[in-house]
Amino acid sequence: MDSREIHHQQQQQQQQQQQQQQQQQHLQQQQQPPPGMLMSHHNSYNRNPNAAAAVLMGHNTSTSQAMHQRLPFGGSMSPHQPQQHQYHHPQPQQQIDQKTLESLGFDGSPSSVAATQQHSMRFGIDHQQVKKKRGRPRKYAADGGGGGGGGSNIALGLAPTSPLPSASNSYGGGNEGGGGGDSAGANANSSDPPAKRNRGRPPGSGKKQLDALGGTGGVGFTPHVIEVKTGEDIATKILAFTNQGPRAICILSATGAVTNVMLRQANNSNPTGTVKYEGRFEIISLSGSFLNSESNGTVTKTGNLSVSLAGHEGRIVGGCVDGMLVAGSQVQVIVGSFVPDGRKQKQSAGRAQNTPEPASAPANMLSFGGVGGPGSPRSQGQQHSSESSEENESNSPLHRRSNNNNSNNHGIFGNSTPQPLHQIPMQMYQNLWPGNSPQ
C-alpha cells in the first residue's frame, strides 16, 4: 500500500472515532435521569432491571472500544474489526435505552424534565399525606358528622387530595397539568363543612306556647277518689275535701245515682231560678272547680258544681248545683288537686304554714266512708223522712248557709259574693280527720 492511502485511512479512522465519541457523550447525557427522578422514582428502576443492566453494559462496551482504538495501528487487530464492533452493538443498546426512557415519559426536552421534577415532588408529598393510621377508624367525625365520605377522611386523618393528572397531561402538557391539579385541590379545600343541625325543640319554645294560650299553668296534678255512700250529700263531701289544704280542686267525673237535687235554672216562670227534682236520676257528668281567692288577707275557695242527670223516662236535666245533691247509690267522684302557679305558691309558703294539712293527704282523702256525726244530712234524713221536702231543704248545710246570707244570695255554688268556707258547719267531719280542728 502506498503511504498516501495509509494516511487517508488514518484520517478516516480518526473522524470515525470522533463521531463515536460524540454519540457516546450524547447517549450518556440521555441515559442520566434528572435529579427529581433519582429522588422519587427509584421504584421504576427496580421494576426494569434489564434496562439498568443494558445501560451499564453499554457504558462498559464504550469504554472497551475507546481503549481498543488507542492501541497502535500495527497490531494484530485489523482496522475493519473495530468498525464492525462499533456499528453492531450500539444499535440495540440505543433502542433499549430509548424504550426505557419513553416508558418513563422522558423525551429529553426541558419541559419534560420540569414536569418530571414537579411530578416527583407531588408524589412525595401525596405519599406522606396518604399514610394510613393504625386501628379502626372512628364512625363519627370530630365535628359530629356522619360516617360518610367527608367523615371518613376526617376520621382517618386524611386531607382531601386532588386526583393526579394523567401521564400525557403531566409530561406532555408541562406546567398546565400541575396547575390544574392545584386548582382542583384548592376547590376541594375551599368547600366548607355542612352546618350542624340541632335536634329537638328549641329551648323556651314550650313556655312560649303556654304563654300564648293565656293564664297560668298549674303544676303537681294529683288525682283523688271520693266515695259517697247512699243518702249522703255529694256537694257537702266535695266542699269538705276542698277545705283540707291550699291546693286547687277540679272535679273530673262521677258515677252513680242521686235522688234529690236542687238546680239553678232561671226562666220566666220561676224568677228565683231554683228548681228541685225528686226521684232517681243517673249521673251523666259532674264537673266544677274550686280555686283560692284572697281578699282582705283572708284566703277562701270559690267555685261551683255543674251536673247533668238522666231520668227513668229518658228525660235529661242539668244545671248548676244550688243546694243539696243527695246520693241515691254508692257514688264515686274523681277529683284532681294541683297548684295553680308554682311561683306564687313559693312566695306564699310562709302563709301556707299556718294552714294545717294532713301528713298523708291521699290516704285521708280516700277515707270518706265513715259515718257522719249527729248533724249529718243522712241522720237528719232518717229522722225526718216523713216530713216535707221544705223541711229537708232547711236542714241541709248548704241551704242553712244560704239562709244566713241576704235574700239575693243563691248559695255557695252561685255567682254571688264568695264567703269563707269556715262559716259552713263542719262538725260532722271531726271524726274523719283527727287532729285537724275545723276552721
From Swiss-Prot:
Residues 217-359 form the PPC domain. Gene3D superfamilies: Hypothetical protein, similar to alpha- acetolactate decarboxylase, domain 2. Residues 143-152, 171-183 have a biased composition (Gly residues). Residues 109-120, 347-357, 428-439 have a biased composition (Polar residues). GO terms for molecular function: minor groove of adenine-thymine-rich DNA binding. Residues 9-31, 79-95, 376-386, 403-416 have a biased composition (Low complexity). A motif (Bipartite nuclear localization signal) lies at residues 131-139. Residues 131-143, 196-208 bind DNA. Residues 130-139 have a biased composition (Basic residues). It is found in: Nucleus. This is AT-hook motif nuclear-localized protein 13. It comes from Arabidopsis thaliana. The gene is AHL13.
